[in-house]
Structure formats: structure tokens, C-alpha cells
């Protein structure tokens, strides 16, 4: 068919072709979206595990329970009141800017340092490790919240159902890692605990003598075995909750579409 072009741009007998298409996201945006999704999948289990470690490390009640459960007073020769006070000092030490942990106790009527130079050196290393855990906890929480707020709620680029699927992937990865660690811990915690120290610390300050070093007298290996099981148990319970909510939402929405 012919048409008249008032602007004289196409001439007689030629109808201008107008292409209509849906905008397609560019490759950079697709890569960014996938990267953000991968960050969310990694950040979710990191947040769960680090939050539970942080919770237990900051719980004076658990320290006090451990002192009584594993006879820390009998091992160290110190009254429970001093041990409980030391527990709070350790919790504060993990949070404050002090370089050296200094706790004074009364021994044979004289004031003395609770820990030796070797023990305070190890606690300095422990504090550095705990700072990494705390920062990982905060950064992973920020990633999870930012992903939900920006990608799901604000831009709508990913649906709630998509978020549920990513959550399942995240907790799946987390449960797999926790499960592997749990198997090693249950089949031989002593070796697993030693391997952890060899990986986490670059020196031998952690090799303490239970006959003379109060740090290991206060916190014997069974204390850490129980703490590891508690962190693993809490993480698994939270993972089950995330799975239940995610699967429940996916099933509910699918059933709703079927009825529609």
C-alpha cells in the first residue's frame, strides 16, 4: 500500500516500518543480577551460623553453665564467683578495643593475673578471629536485607517465589557444610578441634597445658564440643524454619494459581 509522507523522508509508495519490541536487559544487568543472587545464597547461611556463634559467645549464662557442668572451679582452683566475673570480662573483651585481656584474681591472699602471657597472647588471636565472625555476621545481614529490599521489594526484579527458591538454595548449602562439620565433630571431636586450631591460628599459643594454664582449665574440650553442637543445632532449626516458610509459600501460591 502507498502512503504520503508529509516530511518527504520516505517517498511515495513506501510505508515506514515501525518495530515494536519489549526492552531486553543488557548483559551487564543480567550478570549483576546473577551476582547479587549468588551473594544472597552465600550470605544467608553465613548470617545464620555467625549469628549463632555471636549469640553463644556473648551469653554469660552459657559460660556459667559450662563452668558448673565441667567443674572449671575444681580444675582451676578458683571460686565460681571469680570465674563468672572472668566470663563477663571475656565477653566485653571481644566487643571493646582493648589489646590485652587483663583479669585480676586473688590467689593466696595476693592479687594476680588470671592468665599467663601465653594465654593472653592466644586470647588476642581469638579476639581477632571473633572480630572476623562479628563482621561476617554484620555484612551478611546487610547483604540479605539489601537484596530483599532492592531486588524484591523496590525493583520487583525477582518475585517472592524467586526469593523463596534462593533461600532454599542458601540454607541447603549451609546445612551441607554444617552437616559435614558435624560428622567430623561426632566421629572425632578431638582431631577436628585440633585441625580447626591449626587452620585458624598461625602460631602455637593455643597449645595449652591443662595442668597449669587456667584458660583450658576454665574451658576444657568438652565445653567446646557442647558449644559446637549447640551452634549446629540452632542453625539446623533455623534452616528448617526457612525451608518450611519457603516451601509453604511456593506450595500455597501454586495451589492458588491452580484454583484460578
Annotate the PLM regions:
Residues 26-62:
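Hydrophobic secretory-pathway targeting helix
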Residues 30-31, 141-187, 241-260:
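Juxtamembrane interface at the cytosolic side of transmembrane helices
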Residues 55-93:
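Juxtamembrane non-transmembrane segments of integral membrane proteins
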Residues 96-140, 221-235:
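Individual transmembrane alpha-helix segments
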Residues 186-211:
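Juxtamembrane non-transmembrane "cap" segments at the membrane-aqueous interface
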Residues 204-258:
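Terminal transmembrane helical module of multi-pass membrane proteins
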Amino acid at each position: 500500500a502507498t502512503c504520503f509522507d508529509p516530511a518527504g523522508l520516505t517517498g511515495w509508495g513506501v510505508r515506514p516500518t515501525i518495530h515494536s519490541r519489549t526492552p531486553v536487559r543488557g548483559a551487564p544487568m543480567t550478570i549483576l543480577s546473577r551476582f547479587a543472587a549468588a551473594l544472597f545464597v552465600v550470605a544467608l547461611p553465613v548470617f545464620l551460623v555467625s549469628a549463632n556463634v555471636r549469640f553463644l559467645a556473648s551469653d554469660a549464662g552459657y559460660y556459667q553453665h559450662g563452668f558448673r557442668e565441667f567443674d572449671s572451679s575444681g580444675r582451676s582452683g578458683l571460686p565460681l564467683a571469680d570465674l563468672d566475673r572472668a566470663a563477663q570480662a571475656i565477653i566485653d573483651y571481644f566487643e571493646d578495643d582493648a589489646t590485652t585481656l587483663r583479669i585480676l584474681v586473688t590467689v593466696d591472699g595476693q592479687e594476680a593475673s588470671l592468665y599467663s602471657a601465653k594465654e593472653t597472647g592466644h586470647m588476642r588471636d581469638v579476639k581477632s578471629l571473633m572480630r572476623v565472625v562479628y563482621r561476617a555476621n554484620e555484612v551478611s545481614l546487610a547483604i540479605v536485607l539489601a537484596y530483599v529490599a532492592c531486588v524484591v521489594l523496590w525493583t520487583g526484579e525477582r518475585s517472592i517465589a524467586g526469593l523463596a527458591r534462593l533461600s532454599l538454595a542458601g540454607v541447603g548449602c549451609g546445612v551441607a557444610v554444617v552437616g559435614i562439620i558435624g560428622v567430623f565433630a561426632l566421629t572425632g571431636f578431638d582431631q577436628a578441634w585440633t585441625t580447626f586450631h591449626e587452620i585458624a591460628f598461625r602460631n602455637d599459643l593455643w597449645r595449652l597445658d591443662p595442668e597449669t594454664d587456667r584458660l583450658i582449665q576454665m574451658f576444657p574440650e568438652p565445653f567446646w564440643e557442647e558449644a559446637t553442637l549447640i551452634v549446629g543445632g540452632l542453625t539446623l532449626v533455623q534452616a528448617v524454619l526457612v525451608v518450611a516458610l519457603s516451601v509453604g509459600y511456593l506450595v500455597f501460591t501454586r495451589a492458588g494459581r491452580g484454583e484460578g
